[in-house]
Amino acid sequence: MPTALEDYQKNFLELAIESKALRFGEFTLKSGRVSPYFFNLGLFNTGKLLSNLATAYAIAIIQSELKFDVIFGPAYKGIPLASIVCVKLAEIGGSKFQDVKYAFNRKEAKDHGEGGNIVGAALKDQKILIIDDVMTAGTAINEAFEIIAKEEGKVVGSIIALDRQEVVNTEDTEVLSATQSVSKRYDIPVLSIVNLSNIISYLDGRISVEEREKMEQYRQTYGASA
């Protein structure tokens, strides 16, 4: 029996569909897989959409009860996410989130002015939450870990908007999704606003039987074990 979606998750999915950030059809992914859905968080590109997106991230973070000092957004997509979610946490998260800081990396290190590779809060001796849109192969978070380790920070978790719950090719004998692989490799929780199971549950009755069957078939073919 699927877990009932919370209001913030329903709102997120509704806006994702309205903005066409979440689309259905036939899409060839970088992996070569043909997916019945495609997710592009970049289409959350208005003040209203960004505010609602930040609320969804913030509620997921608050409910996790994860303790951290800095939200780190890997360049480029993670940069606006880190800043808007930092603001939203201060607005709705109560006193313990008032002093949460944010930071992001430059793609090219700056050799003048303040210099360095990090913009925003210093990462040294800080507990870091990495924020991003999706996690496909885990490449971006691996790079983020290297950057944060170089700055002597400690990653305590990661959060993404959508967990596709798809298997990836790993060196492990286990068949794991990207989020499961990262969680196991770094021993951290990987949070998400929604996952593929949530999408399928939400769409029940909202799409045709044929479209739902394609979603279910895709999950059966590429889905990782819970």
UniProtKB/Swiss-Prot annotation:
The protein's annotated pathway: Pyrimidine metabolism; UMP biosynthesis via de novo pathway; UMP from orotate: step 1/2
Domain of life (superkingdom): Eukaryota
This enzyme's EC code(s): 2.4.2.10
Binding site for 5-phospho-alpha-D-ribose 1-diphosphate: 30, 76-77, 106-107, 110, 112, 132-140
Gene3D superfamilies: 3.40.50.2020
GO molecular function, one term: orotate phosphoribosyltransferase activity
A GO biological-process term: 'de novo' UMP biosynthetic process
Subunit structure: Homodimer.
NCBIfam families per the UniProt record, alphabetical: pyrE
Protein name, UniProt field: Orotate phosphoribosyltransferase
Natural source organism: Kluyveromyces lactis (strain ATCC 8585 / CBS 2359 / DSM 70799 / NBRC 1267 / NRRL Y-1140 / WM37)
